[in-house]
Amino acid sequence: MTEKTSSLVFSAQYVALVHTICSFAAFFIPLALALYTHYYQVVKNEFYGYPEEWFPSVSATIGDWYPERSVFQWLIALTATPRLLVLLLWFTLSGISRPSVIITTALGVLRTALCGGWVYVTSTDDHDWHDIFMIGYLISNAPWFILVSKCSPVNSMASRIRNIGSALFVLTIFPLIYWYIQHKFKHIPGAYTVYAFFEWSLILWDILFDSALYWDFKPLVFNLHTSKTYSNPSSFATRKKEKGEHLSYAEAAAVGTQAKNIKKDSNVKCSKKQILFSLLYFSSEVYLSFVFWSVLTSLGLLVWYFPLWHMGISGYEACILFELSPFLLGIPLLRKFASKVPVIFLFLNVIGIAAYKLEDPVHRLFVTAFSVCCECLAWTSLFSNISPENLAIERKISTFLFGLLASSIAKYSFFSNNPIWPILNETNGGKQIPALIVGIIACLIFAIFHVQQTTANAVEHFKLRKITALSAALSLGTVLFCLHTFLCDSTVLMTWSWDGYPIKGPQPYPHGAVSIVVSICAVLVAPYLYQSGAFMLIGFVLACFGSYFMYINHGWCSYLGGLIFTSYVLIYSFASIRISSFYSPAKVWGGAFLVYILYSLAHVWVVAYEFVPGGPILRERTSYILIFIGWNLAALVPAYSGESKEPNKADSSVVDIKQSDSSYRRRSFKKSLLTGFCLALMALKFAIQNMPPYDYTPYHPNEKLFTAGIWTIHFGLDNFMYASENRIRDAVRDMELDVFGLLESDTQRLIMGFRDLTQVLAHDLGMYADYGPGPDKHTWGAALLSKFPIVNSTHHLLPSPQGELAPAIHATLDVYGELIDVVVSHNGQYESQLDRRLQSTELARIMRESPRPLVFLGYVVSNVGQEPQTILTRDTGMLDIEPADYDRWCQYIFYRGVKRIGYARLHRSTITDTELQTGKFLVTKDLGRNVRIDKEHVPESHRYPSLFEGTGVNGHYYDNNLVVHEPWYYD
């Protein structure tokens, strides 16, 4: 026997891990590159392109364009080595003398070769051979799945992953074939995009199946050394045992023994009744969490109504302090009561949904605030009642986050309005009655089945280094704010990434569903990741980069950065909430909601009006908030100090958290998976259902006529604190507006409910929509909607040295085949004459430099014939739509290069505080005499609707000023 001269020992799991990472990277890095560099090319197929098709197939991604094709082939080449090593290790592990193992290994080599065939022979190179290799690869998967599952060593985790992966793979094949037929033979628009999703799913399920080898290889160790092997296998085993080392599977096979002492996961079998009850309880918690997030996200929206209409501090802002109710748990009696019967507070929370029935805005606010008070007490108690060593807390966190995602899906289904918010009722889409019924049932189920859950076995110890209660509160408060700000609505990240036309990034429909599905996946994998200190550190760094790209960039880069950041926040939530259970709920949860409120105020102050006290401190400084978020998230990262078989009892700063046995976690995962699957299906349903057709027709296409309007809509809240989108839609439709601008329209903020008013208007009216500068631009919003295609649009932030930033949109429309520019702007307030003058000067420059016909729709804040209004018409060629209308102050319409044929001002009703101002124009070279004429001389098709004459309808009529009491017409 020779002596060893050198050696290298490492776990074989690393090989499986590298193989999984390389496999995933080989496909999804090229996908990201393709979406970023050749989006419109890769989504195009033989029948359709964008927007009918909006997601690329695997073949288009990996085979058609540089650099993604080269990157893919390079990464696949890197995958080859770990792939062959994995096959060799599995062959050694499973028994080299078994015929079935030999056949399976040979099949694995063949499968690898077939993969190389369709990788390096692309569909562009040779379509037939590419398909032959691809079909052969897919067919070989069936026996591969069966044989590997049968021949692999017993391991419950690996078996579970293989079962999931193979089942999903097989189930995906059938819809894949169906949608391919719909595309190839029936030529249905959008079918190939659906097919592409199933095709990419096959890749994921394939990688998932092979990733199970990571758990198979846990007892397998690489021991590379220069000496010869031991000649006597039994002596080798004896030496290993004398050293106290365990035999690996391969070593046990070599000496003819079996590893009998490997721990097997306990398999606790539950009856069908227990499974049903457990699922009902889980579902009730998800629904009650949905109510929690729905009510919490509505409070800021209700509070915002009062300073909005008072144009200053109203006093009702103090209602946000109801969120500090967890501080009351410092009272022992209340804490004990909330701990024993949390269902009472949950029930009061559900009853708060009925606040919508109260017509008085003040009463509605107070009831909602009380509901928030109860729900904060209830959920704080629910989390605090569970020991951090009890894995039931993981399930509780999962239901808490699924409830958040359910509220996001509810908003997604109603075009960014939550159907159970108090700003909705039976007339504008509210669904509170069904929500109340389900909520009461959920409370009953919760009351019946609510018991403390216990963990069956402690497999190993995981050490968390204690942090201070202050750090825990900062961390948790930051989590609550991030969950609310970035995840309560699936389109938040899209408005951050929006940069106008042509479209360079995601759209609410269908990509909002992508955001939801990614979030669901993050919640599902979080229990397996948040306990890893390495992941938390690396994830934190990636999340910081993600938030940076989300804020700095636009389009897909910003969106992907946001997805990385929000996914980390969801996973981080498990650690933050679990650690908070170590401390007094009054200290940590009360402190957390205080931090949350401070964040919320800062979130408002970044767009503070000039007259808001302290506005300059944070105005236009969202970057400061993101830095504070990163700083406070980092408070938790040092808590991870690594793993140990036995906790260090001498170190009093170390807290032991016992991990669950696999049976408990498996059952929890199954419930989470089922819930996530149902939520994902709903999101995909609404994404497909509300996909815009991008094929719209103006109201008078044969007349070459268009009607334009401008309306300041007060953030979509009417005089009675109800959502006004539907009423705005009806007025715009009845006025037959083809192009209109909306001002005070950026509602993608915490105090405005993260709504997107353009979604429902564009959908119901059949229009293209430009949201305007997003929430990252620190304005109060300007939006453009058009029946005509928006060829190009540019967003401007007008000079504002003293007050809030003023937004503007400069868009080019294809109006009956002619390019016509439209400018929509919202200038500063009366308090700052300097701002208004500089803003008007910049707008004049934009219009002067445009060579095309142009219509200006804006908020100027000026007397007629005085500065800054005259700055916009001086040296720009722009004409005031009606100079004789002296009763104007805010809204103005200017035009040039088109023929003015009509002008009307429509009463606002109770929608807002400003009328709808409109103009009718003809696209013609003959600009007419530019004189006013009687209505009788105007063709019927050129007239304004008679619907609003006299007393009008729905509170709208043609009399809203001292001058223009009916539509005026011109030649």
Curated annotation (Swiss-Prot):
Spans traversing the lipid bilayer: 15-35, 71-91, 101-121, 129-149, 161-181, 188-208, 286-306, 313-333, 336-356, 366-386, 397-417, 432-452, 467-487, 509-529, 532-552, 555-575, 588-608, 622-642, 673-693
GO biological process, any: fungal-type cell wall organization
Presence of keyword Transferase: no
Membrane topology term: Multi-pass membrane protein
UniProt region (PGAP2-like), positions on chain: 1-242
Gene3D superfamilies registered for this protein in UniProt: Endonuclease/exonuclease/phosphatase
Catalytic machinery residues: H826
PGAP2IP-like: annotated segments: 243-971
Subcellular localization: Cell membrane; Endoplasmic reticulum membrane
InterPro entries membership: Endo/exonu/phosph_ase_sf, Frag1/DRAM/Sfk1, GPI-anchor_lipid_remodeler, PGAP2IP_TM_1nd, PGAP2IP_TM_2nd
Function per UniProt: Involved in the maintenance of cell wall integrity. Required for the replacement of the diacylglycerol moiety by ceramides during GPI-anchor maturation.
Family, as annotated: In the N-terminal section; belongs to the PGAP2 family.
Protein name per the record: Protein cwh43
